[in-house]
Amino acid sequence: MAASGGSGGKATELLRCLPRVTLANLRPNPGARHREKRRGRGIHGGRKSGRGHKGETQRGNQPRLGFEGGQTPFYLVIPKYGYNEGHSFRRQYQPLSLNRLQYLIDLGRIDPTQPIDLTQLVNARGVTIQPLKRDYGVQLVEEGADLFAAKVNIEVQWASQLAIAAIEKNGGLITTGFYDPRSLDVLCKPVPFFMRGQPIPKRMLPPEDLVKYYTDAENRGYLADPRNVLEARKQLARKYGYVLPDITKDELYQMLSTRKDPRQIFFGLAPGWIVNMPEKKILKPTDERLLSYYSS
C-alpha cells in the first residue's frame, strides 16, 4: 500500500527507512553535554587558569565548607535545641471529630446499637490507621460537640475532656485503651488475620510513660477502677452543667456496659481463640498451659 502524500506520508516513509532504536545507536541530543574546561597544568597554565591573582585561592586548595577564616563558625556559635528530638519514636493518633462520628452514624456506616472500636471506625472509612507509620490509634476531638446526639459505647486511644462530656451527656460511655502495634494491626485488619488461621494474640500492656494516663479515671482509662470512673463521670457532669443519665435503666444497658478485658483485642473474642473463616467456626484452646499464658 502506497504511503499517502504530504508531511504524514514523508514521516511514515522516514520511519520505515530508519534503523530500530537500540543501545548501540542511542546518543545524547546535540548540545546536551558540555565538555568541562580543562585548567592549565604546570607551565602550560594559560595565564591565570581561572584562579585569579596571587594568594591562597591561586596556590592552594579552597577552604573547607563552613570555614569562616578562623573565627568560631556559625554552626558552633548557635546552640542546639532538641525541637525534633525523638521524632521518629513519637506516637501518632489520627483525629476523629464528633462531627465526623455523627456523620458516619447518620449514613448507617456505624451501628450505634453495637460497641464501637477501631474495627468499626476503619471499616466505615472514618479513619485510616497505619501502624508502620507510628500510628497508635484514634484521638477523639471535640469538634461538633454541640451537634453530637448519638448514644454510643465507644473505645478510642485518646480523648479530650469536652469530647468525653459530649458522649456521656447523651447517655453513652467512652473508654480509652492502649494497643501495641501488632494488636493494632490485627484490630484494623481482622479478616486477613483470620484467614491466616493464627490464634488471636493477647494485647500488651501500655509502656511506662502511658500507665498514668490509662489508669486515670478522668481519662476513662481502661485500667482505671470502675468505682473511680463512676465518680469522675459525676464530677464531669457537674463541671459542664448537665444531668448524667442513668444508664442502668436504659434498654441498651447490656451493650453500654460492655467492656474489653485489658488483654482482649476484639469484642466477644478472647486471646488464644482461632477463627476458622471457611468453616465459620471458633476454635478454643483447652491446654492448661495455653489458658494460663493467654489469661496472664
Curated annotation (Swiss-Prot):
Biological processes annotated in GO: translation
Keywords: Mitochondrion, Ribonucleoprotein, Ribosomal protein, Transit peptide
GO molecular function terms listed in the Swiss-Prot or TrEMBL record: structural constituent of ribosome
Sequence segments annotated as region (Disordered): 25-66
Key word Transit peptide present: yes
Signal sequence residues: none
Domain of life: Eukaryota
Bias (Basic residues) ranges: 32-52
Residue interval of the organelle targeting sequence: 1-20
Assigned GO CC terms: mitochondrial large ribosomal subunit
Location of this chain's protein in the cell: Mitochondrion
Family membership: Belongs to the universal ribosomal protein uL15 family.
HAMAP family noted in UniProt: Ribosomal_uL15
Self-association state and partner proteins as the record states: Component of the mitochondrial ribosome large subunit (39S) which comprises a 16S rRNA and about 50 distinct proteins.
Name of the protein in question: Large ribosomal subunit protein uL15m
Species: Xenopus laevis
